[in-house]
Curated annotation (Swiss-Prot):
Its main location: cytoplasm. It is found in: Cytoplasm. It holds the Pfam family PUA_3. The gene is rlmI. It comes from Vibrio vulnificus (strain CMCP6). This is Ribosomal RNA large subunit methyltransferase I. Belongs to the methyltransferase superfamily. RlmI family. It catalyses: cytidine(1962) in 23S rRNA + S-adenosyl-L-methionine = 5-methylcytidine(1962) in 23S rRNA + S-adenosyl-L-homocysteine + H(+). Its EC number is 2.1.1.191. Residues 2-80 form the PUA domain.
């Protein structure tokens, strides 16, 4: 008989509504001796069977639901999940001409703790939960069955694994080692991705729609692209006809790739058109403000400021500071394109921070457009936490 967990009376409601997380305080008792990541049956207080879940004894999220149906969690299970995810994305893959996209968006694709990004024929896995680690071989075997010619590389070098009792790890799981540069295409733009050494799994695929939408604000404009990384927004700004784009980032290797990406797309990167500036964005914004330097468009896409609730207040101050500075260096009629990828910061809070930043900058500002993560990053209706990326276009009057 498999191990099982029984829920505290009244705590069945979220599982019945198909939320995939079961917290430690919601568990009344554990039967058997489930090991790290092992699949357990989930029962209500009344003994009614509810779900199959992965057990994680060291995490506050004590179990993550694989399925609300009575089925084995094996290779065939993951084959079906991956096939369903690929089918869900077929339209956007064709529409946007994608050779790089998110194949599996963790809980939102019924695979909690599992992220899989595809770059050409390289599939990059992040396994962030005990259950995902326990099922690693089944997941890899399922990928091989669905995509026979695939190469699979693991980028589980993420600190959140420690909360699950896991060590950070990377390496080839199947096939070849990724080369230094894998070139993908989206919306007709070519982008070089460093799978092994880049941020996350190599690139920020979730901002694809925002990059495309940014193009309508940049024609014949002076653009400052903050936290530019490998130049994603800057590439779209050049494609959109920007007069000049300054890409600012603290990482010289990222800026070198940004320049390479511009050359890859055969954009004009003379100093009159494109600049790749190694700088601390916070200091740079203050320097521009103090010098009286102004821009038509500022793009503000910072890294995640809040990894935990304890960091949220500090993150709010950081977001407010950079957006206030951005408003201060915008010309009248200028546009701020600003984003937050911190899931702990909801849309209403982010909007309030931007509003407060406008007040502190002494500028009259209108919200004119809202942005969210790209369509290959879906949000399951039972899992609102899957909505994490938000952004605004703000017009300075």
């Amino acid at each position: 008989m498999s191990a099982a967990i029984y829920l505290v009376k009244g705590r069945e409601k979220s599982v019945v509504r198909r939320h995939p997380w079961i917290f430690s305080r919601g568990i009344d008792r554990v039967e058997g001796n489930p090991q790290l990541g092992e699949t357990v049956d989930v029962y209500g207080h009344d003994g009614k069977w509810l779900a199959k879940a992965a057990y994680s004894p060291e995490s506050q999220i004590r179990a993550r639901v694989w399925s609300f149906e009575k089925q084995d969690i094996n290779r065939a299970f993951f084959v079906k999940r991956i096939q369903d995810a690929q089918l869900l994305r077929e339209d956007v893959i064709e529409r946007d001409g994608l050779t790089g996209y998110r194949l599996i968006a963790a809980e939102s694709d019924g695979m909690p703790g599992v992220t899989i990004d595809r770059y050409q024929n390289f599939f990059v896995c992040q396994l962030l939960s005990a259950g995902a680690e326990h099922q690693k071989q089944n997941i890899v075997d399922a990928l091989i069955e669905v995509f026979p010619d695939c190469n699979v590389y693991e980028r589980s070098d993420v600190s959140v694994r420690k909360k699950e009792g896991l060590q950070e790890t990377t390496g080839v799981l199947h096939g070849e080692m990724p080369p230094k540069s894998v070139v993908i295409e989206e919306n007709g733009v070519k982008i070089s991705v460093d799978i092994v050494g880049g941020h996350k799994t190599g690139f920020y695929l979730d901002q694809r729609d925002s990059r495309q939408q940014a193009m309508k604000y940049v024609k014949d404009k002076e653009v400052l692209n903050c936290f530019s990384y490998t130049g994603g927004f800057g590439l779209y700004a050049l494609k959109g006809g920007a007069k000049r784009v300054i890409n600012a980032d603290v990482s010289q290797p990222a800026l070198d790739t940004a320049k390479f990406n511009a050359e890859l797309n055969e954009f004009d990167i003379s100093k009159k058109r494109a600049v790749f500036l190694n700088a601390d964005v916070f200091k740079l914004l203050r320097e521009y403000r103090d010098q009286g330097t102004k821009f038509d468009v500022v793009i503000m896409d910072p890294p995640k400021f809040a990894e935990s609730k304890a960091q949220l207040n500090g993150a709010c101050r950081g977001y407010k500071d950079i957006n206030m500075l951005a408003f201060e260096i915008l010309k009248s009629g200028g546009t701020l394109l600003t984003y937050s990828c911190s899931g702990l910061m909801d849309l209403a809070l982010f909007q309030k921070i931007i509003a407060d930043a406008a007040v502190d900058a002494g500028r009259t500002v209108k919200f004119v457009e809202r942005f969210e993560q790209a369509a290959d990053h879906p949000v399951d209706t039972a899992y609102p936490e899957g909505f994490y990326l938000k952004g605004f276009a703000c017009k300075v009057i």
